[in-house]
Regions:
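Glycine-rich beta-strand-centered segment in the early N-terminal region that forms part
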Residues: 21-38, 48-92
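Short helix-loop-beta connector
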Residues: 80, 110-113, 136-142, 205-206
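N-terminal Rossmann-like NAD(P) cofactor-binding module of classical short-chain dehydrogenase/reductase
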Residues: 86, 144, 211-212
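A structural motif shared across PLP-dependent enzymes of the aminotransferase-like
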Residues: 89-102
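Mid-domain Rossmann-like dinucleotide-binding core that forms the NAD(H)/NADP(H) cofactor-binding site
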Residues: 118-193
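Short amphipathic alpha-helix with an adjacent loop that forms part of the alpha/beta core around
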Residues: 195-205
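Glycine-rich phosphate-binding loop and adjacent beta-alpha segment
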Residues: 218-290, 321-327
Length: 327
């Protein structure tokens, strides 16, 4: 099969399209003919040697995919050959075939193309898990999402709206308008405006129940200030820096919680549990028209280096999708 292979660590030029052996499904796994996938920040970090993937004969990145079941393991009863499925995975999705545990695979939402479904699982599961399962966001609650125009951000905005919560964001320039169109209750241009002051004003000084932050660095101090009493900061990335200094005393009167989260490093049981819960609770919202995948641009698998360059330019609103094969 054809796959993206990281031959050495560095810039986009280290990525190669190679012929590699197809993976073999285990007894509880399904082999999927991948039609579509998508690019995530973790793929860029893995390419640079900063975010190791699972041990593989060939280092193939990719954290999500959609396609058709090609074969099933002997213990699999949930899926049949030809079923359209999507899934998160720890790696290997930027290839013509991928394997995943049968209970981790999810049915593609009715009416959705495989091209869109390939860009759905990673960001929507990440955002839903962070906001609801880790952050405890409830209907009627309030959230602040940094990097609101990213894949996770555009998913988080819609998830807040779909559950009857308010989702405010920070973004840059014209991206704020795109976030507002998706349903953000507040969109602050962090390059020109004081987002903490805007959050305080928008909430009448109360603050927000959940902050979903993938920036890190010096945002932490202001994130604590932006919290309501009993609020939670969910740290899902450190794009702006992995070190921060803030006064611990701020946490005490707010009874605040800081939670770190990442999907790739979780156990199989945890990934199965979150995938099944997502399939039951969130996938129906796509079928009801409450949620959609926001795709900024599509690239063919052969153009994977250009896709990496595009993401590094930070101009995208939503997902950068990959077309692996036609159909």
């Amino acid at each position: 099969m054809r796959a993206v292979v990281i031959e050495s660590y560095g810039g986009p030029e280290v990525l190669a399209i190679c012929e590699v052996p197809a993976p073999e499904p285990g007894p509880d796994e399904v082999l999927v003919d991948v039609v579509a996938s998508a690019l995530n920040r973790a793929d860029l970090l893995q390419r640079m040697g900063l975010y190791p993937g699972p041990s593989m004969e060939y280092e193939v990145p990719g954290l999500e995919f959609a396609g058709r079941v090609a074969s099933v393991g002997e213990a699999v009863g949930r899926w049949l050959v030809g079923d359209e499925v999507m899934a998160i995975t720890s790696g290997g999705a930027h290839a013509e075939q991928a394997v995943v545990h049968a209970d981790q695979a999810m049915a593609v939402p009715a009416g959705m193309s495989l091209a869109d479904a390939g860009a759905l699982p990673e960001v929507f599961i990440t955002a839903w898990d962070a906001l609801v399962l880790q952050g405890g966001l409830q209907p009627g609650g309030t959230a602040l999402v940094h990097a609101g125009a990213s894949g996770v951000g555009t998913a988080a905005i819609q998830l807040c709206r779909s559950m009857g919560a308010e989702g405010g964001v920070t973004a840059s320039g014209s991206k704020c308008a795109a976030c507002t169109e998706l349903g953000a209750s507040l969109a602050v241009d962090y390059t020109t405006d004081d987002w903490l002051a805007a959050v305080r004003d928008h909430t009448g000084g109360r603050g927000v129940d959940v902050v979903l932050d993938v920036v890190g660095g010096d945002y932490l101090d202001r994130n604590v200030d932006a919290l309501a009493v009993g609020g939670t900061i969910v740290q899902g990335g450190v794009m702006g820096g992995g070190k921060a200094t803030f006064g611990l005393g701020k946490l005490l009167p707010k009874r605040a919680t800081i939670v770190g989260t990442v999907l790739r490093g979780r156990s199989l049981d945890e990934k199965v549990a979150v995938s099944r819960a997502f399939a039951d609770e969130v996938v129906p919202r796509f079928e009801e028209g409450m949620l959609r995948v926001v795709v900024d641009r599509r690239f063919d698998l052969d153009d994977i280096a250009a896709a990496h360059v595009h993401m590094e330019g930070n101009a995208n609103v939503g997902k950068i999708a990959l077309d692996v094969r036609t159909g």
